[in-house]
């Protein structure tokens, strides 16, 4: 269940930012700043995709969990049983 719930957003966002970074430059009109606009589109797509990917991967496998005292753990265990 976890693999499917994680794979779908990754595929959707990869496709979305891939289209912006790859297909977006084809729609930039010709002009003196065309190269700058294409560079901005590709750089924006790469940066936004990397930001999203790092954020989603950090939530998927956190480095540390919540820090609870022993009394809190025993209390929660008592209430949930």
UniProtKB/Swiss-Prot annotation:
Expressed in brain (at protein level). Residues 29-35 are cytoplasmic. The chain crosses the membrane at residues 8-28, 36-56. It holds the Pfam family ATP_synt_H. Residues 1-7, 57-81 are lumenal. Glycans are attached at residue 70. InterPro entries: ATPase_V0-cplx_e1/e2_su (IPR008389), ATPase_V0-cplx_e1/e2_su_met (IPR017385). The keyword S-adenosyl-L-methionine does not apply. The keyword Ion transport applies. GO terms for molecular function: proton-transporting ATPase activity, rotational mechanism. It is a multi-pass membrane protein. This is V-type proton ATPase subunit e 2. It comes from Bos taurus (Bovine). The lineage of its organism: Eukaryota, Metazoa, Chordata, Craniata, Vertebrata. The gene is ATP6V0E2.
């Amino acid at each position: 269940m976890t693999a499917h719930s994680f794979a779908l957003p990754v595929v959707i966002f990869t496709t979305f930012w891939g289209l912006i970074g790859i297909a977006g430059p084809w729609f930039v009109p010709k002009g003196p700043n065309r190269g700058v606009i294409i560079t901005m589109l590709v750089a924006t797509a790469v940066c936004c995709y990397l930001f999203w990917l790092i954020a989603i991967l950090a939530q998927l496998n956190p480095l540390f969990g919540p820090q609870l005292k022993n009394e809190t753990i025993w209390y929660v265990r008592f209430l949930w049983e």
